[in-house]
Amino acid sequence: MARLKEIYWKEIAPKLKEELKLSNVMEVPRVTKITLNMGLGEAVGDKKVIEHAVADLEKITGQKVVVTYARKSIAGFKVREGWPIGVKVTLRRERMYEFLDRLLSISLPRVRDFRGLNAKSFDGRGNYSMGVKEQIIFPEIDYDKIDALRGLDITLTTTAKNDDEGRALLRAFKFPFRN
């Protein structure tokens, strides 16, 4: 079992049950999935960009990546319908907890000038989104082998009913919020 999953069920869930005054341990909010997305606008001019992004995201997550395609043509962005414009991957269960563990203990401390995560990045339903400016904060990425610095979006989907429950859950996981 993943280290964070064990910590969640043995320590975090009982503590949150009391804190949120819930009657059943199954009502306690939990993380259901983590979605990583790389929007690649520069892929319009160079098709190799998608290949490099797929390789990077597969190294980071250890899972097969899905290429996303443009739904409709937008002349202003020089994008045609059906062109590849991004990559994404959804992590659940064990891999999700392992990724979350690596993100909190290894990757976030490697961010330059890191002052904490914005505590206001919740969506109103207890889900949290954050952006990473460079993929090199992940230990799986070798700095010498990358072609360009790319950012990615990380979204944590939870079963929390509102932002306060979601915030309590992520604080229990020791998320480094700045405010």
From Swiss-Prot:
Classification via PROSITE patterns: RIBOSOMAL_L5 (PS00358)
Keyword Ligase: no
Source domain of life: Bacteria
Key words of the record: Ribonucleoprotein, Ribosomal protein, RNA-binding, rRNA-binding, tRNA-binding
SUPFAM superfamilies: RL5-like
GO biological process: translation
Family (UniProt): Belongs to the universal ribosomal protein uL5 family.
Function statement: This is one of the proteins that bind and probably mediate the attachment of the 5S RNA into the large ribosomal subunit, where it forms part of the central protuberance. In the 70S ribosome it contacts protein S13 of the 30S subunit (bridge B1b), connecting the 2 subunits; this bridge is implicated in subunit movement. Contacts the P site tRNA; the 5S rRNA and some of its associated proteins might help stabilize positioning of ribosome-bound tRNAs.
Subunit structure: Part of the 50S ribosomal subunit; part of the 5S rRNA/L5/L18/L25 subcomplex. Contacts the 5S rRNA and the P site tRNA. Forms a bridge to the 30S subunit in the 70S ribosome.
Protein name as catalogued: Large ribosomal subunit protein uL5
Gene that this sequence comes from: rplE
